[in-house]
Amino acid sequence: LSPGYATSGIPSADLKWESNKTLNVGIDMGFLEQRIIVSPEFYLNKSSNLLLNSRVPTSSGHKTMMRNIGKTSNIGFDLSITSVNIQKKNFTWTTNFNVSHNRNKIEALSGEQYFLEEARFGYDQKTHKIEVGKPIGQFYGYKTLGLYQVEDFDYNAKDQTYTLKEGIPYMSGTFNRSDIRPGMWKFDDRNGDKVIDDSDMTVIGNANPDFYGGLNNQFKYKGWDFSFFFTFSYGGEVLNATKLTNTKT
């Protein structure tokens, strides 16, 4: 064997710095001699010239090339409430509650309408869809219809085998019809061609929560202080990468 070298990608001489424009509007309001402070804030952020891998012709010998092709926007609202519950000479107890709501959107991909990306944990299946007009964080995959039932099969009592009935869709590119068994995952044949393949994949979830926040309590006694913090998030789906990798059927 002889060592060799090859290019890992196509360089681009036209790359630019990513840029951001942000607008923040907020106000601080104090009550009861500043023992309660309420701080609402609205923000709008627009990012352009985002660096993304763009598809290139296969004749180049590569699949993608890094380019400035993306534009995104973020719009949201933050609310913070701080209260001084106890304030003595040697002891203070302060509480802070905050909640946030954010919505992001892909504004442009410079000619492209969408990209399909892998989760990058050693699994070659596309798991994310980056699409113009949609939020970042869309999960992409197959919709399930539950599990294959005994009624979906012809049973041969002589050799005690199950054979999937004709006309019932299955992943023909991954399994033979004789490999399918009751209890295996059954996926939605979205285009009705009786075959489960990449054309049946669709957006199945979104990682973005509806809102999220936290609650912090801080206690100070002379030269000592102690605090504890809780966080919460409501809405948004989670991609179970371990289950995705280890569950093939």
What residue ranges belong to the model's regions?
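Extracellular/periplasmic, surface-exposed regions of secreted and cell-surface proteins
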Residues: 1-134
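Solvent-exposed, flexible loop/coil residues
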Residues: 2, 19, 47, 54-56, ...
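Glycine- and acidic
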Residues: 9, 62-64, 198-201, 210
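Active-site proximal loops enriched in glycine and acidic residues that flank catalytic Cys/His/Asp
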Residues: 41-44, 200, 228-234
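Conserved small-residue
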Residues: 67, 86-205, 247-248
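Extracytoplasmic gating/loop element in the C-terminal half of outer-membrane beta-barrel translocons
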Residues: 179-182, 233-249
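C-terminal substrate/ligand-recognition segments
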Residues: 206-236
